[in-house]
From Swiss-Prot:
This is Small ribosomal subunit protein uS10. Keywords: Ribonucleoprotein, Ribosomal protein. InterPro entries: Ribosomal_uS10 (IPR001848), Ribosomal_uS10_CS (IPR018268), Ribosomal_uS10_dom (IPR027486), Ribosomal_uS10_dom_sf (IPR036838). Part of the 30S ribosomal subunit. One of its GO terms (cellular component) is ribosome. Involved in the binding of tRNA to the ribosomes. Belongs to the universal ribosomal protein uS10 family. GO terms for molecular function: structural constituent of ribosome; tRNA binding. One of its GO terms (biological process) is translation. The gene is rpsJ.
């Protein structure tokens, strides 16, 4: 797999679990001999939902809920077969969405 690059995008609602997952990926890749660029923090998506508190009236009384999606980008340059196998077997925390592009 010479001169190849693996791009890993991580998404999660909690930044702590996202950072631990990124740390595990970087540690696994460097342990198997690949060079790593990242984790690069990408812009956080912020979704805001406004809901009326009362069931039928009192439209002036509203409540707002916010959902933030944190993202990280990791590039693994010149991965070996050992690196790919180790990444496939890696156990990441739940709640982290992983997208891998070769």
């Amino acid at each position: 797999m010479a001169n190849k690059k693996i791009r890993i995008r991580l998404k999660a609602y909690e930044h702590r679990t996202l950072d631990t997952a990124a740390e595990k990926i970087v540690e696994t890749a460097t342990r198997t001999g690949a060079s790593v660029a990242g984790p690069v923090p990408l812009p956080t998506e912020r979704s805001l939902y406004t809901v009326i508190r009362a069931t039928h009236k009192y439209k002036d009384s509203r409540e707002q809920f916010e959902m933030r999606t944190h993202k990280r980008l990791i590039d693994i340059v010149n991965p070996t077969q050992k690196t790919v196998d180790a990444l496939m077997k890696l156990d990441l925390p739940s709640g982290v969405n992983v997208e891998i592009k070769l």
